[in-house]
Amino acid sequence: MAITIGINGFGRIGRLVLRIALQRSDIKVVAVNDPFIAPEYAAYMFKYDSTHGRYKGEVTSKDDSLVIDGQSIKVFGEKDPASIPWGKAGVDYVIESTGVFTTTEGAQKHIDGGAKKVIITAPSSDAPMFVVGVNEQKYTPDLKIVSNASCTTNCLAPLAKVINDKFGIEEGLMTTVHSITATQKTVDGPSHKDWRGGRTASGNIIPSSTGAAKAVGKVIPELNGKLTGMSLRVPTVDVSVVDLTVRLKKSATYEEISEAIKAASNGELKGILGYTEDAVVSTDFLGSDYSSIFDQKAGILLSPTFVKLISWYDNEFGYSTRVVDLLEHVAKASN
């Protein structure tokens, strides 16, 4: 029996989640909700993507539906999640990808509208967070609302897990060099909470805050309080990179650290954590479905207990793939 899902918010993540879900035989997307996008425009936005390219199948709209490769997907335009008729549409699982309803209270409205469970595609202040490959096995069926954490946490956590399991992490600092996102400005404009964030995205390197490193402590409790970090927003459209600098409990050579990561990438974290020794740059990872790809040639070691590790991630496509993976895990655990 197919997992029936609805997507709330047809932005960058919502549209990519739909692309990925359409490739999975066990998932059926039956509805999309976005108050700002009519069906005809939704078809256009889904078909053409400046970053990931044109959708290779057939995309049209008919009345109040999106039609993709002959499959009809209902399009709603409700602002209040509680007003979306998920139940009537036959939706069991909602992907909450607006970036607005990130608390259990906000996500609960989807359940009030007839859905059974909700996966939030952003960090949440109170919903339990899961990172596939790290702690998804701790999911229990009684949890109706969960968070897939952030794209950066999904990159950092698998890497941190391997290092902590093998060598122990005393403490660490993370910097993510992060591509432009939709909340940034095309030209200088008002941004009252974050003044720097109001500056032109395409012409600046912009320091910003991120809770991604601290969030690792929520998915790996042993690292709680041991990691923090910051972000540098840079003028690239997609693909970001994590710089993790840690003090180890156990002495190691850079080769030993690399071997541990390589072993994990071929073992328990296969398909989640990648490994490369090639002379790569950011665009080489466009469309990558890994959460994190360790760049063996880019890291450095100062002493046997002090090391800098570099890992790439497609912050759109890799993350959206994990959203769908978590959905499948939740559905399987719930049946």
UniProtKB/Swiss-Prot annotation:
Homotetramer. Its EC number is 1.2.1.12. The keyword S-adenosyl-L-methionine does not apply. This is Glyceraldehyde-3-phosphate dehydrogenase. It is an enzyme of class 1 (oxidoreductase). The active site is at C151. The gene is GPD. The keyword Cell cycle does not apply. Its main location: cytoplasm. It comes from Debaryomyces hansenii (strain ATCC 36239 / CBS 767 / BCRC 21394 / JCM 1990 / NBRC 0083 / IGC 2968). It catalyses: D-glyceraldehyde 3-phosphate + phosphate + NAD(+) = (2R)-3-phospho-glyceroyl phosphate + NADH + H(+). SUPFAM superfamilies: Glyceraldehyde-3-phosphate dehydrogenase-like, C-terminal domain, NAD(P)-binding Rossmann-fold domains. D-glyceraldehyde 3-phosphate binds at S150, C151, T152, T181, T210, G211, R233. InterPro entries: GlycerAld/Erythrose_P_DH, GlycerAld_3-P_DH_AS, GlycerAld_3-P_DH_cat, GlycerAld_3-P_DH_NAD(P)-bd, Glyceraldehyde-3-P_DH_1, NAD(P)-bd_dom_sf. NCBIfam families: GAPDH-I. Belongs to the glyceraldehyde-3-phosphate dehydrogenase family. GO terms for biological process: glucose metabolic process; glycolytic process. The record marks H178 as: Activates thiol group during catalysis. GO terms for cellular component: cytosol. It is found in: Cytoplasm. GO terms for molecular function: glyceraldehyde-3-phosphate dehydrogenase (NAD+) (phosphorylating) activity; NAD binding; NADP binding. Keywords: Cytoplasm, Glycolysis, NAD, Oxidoreductase.
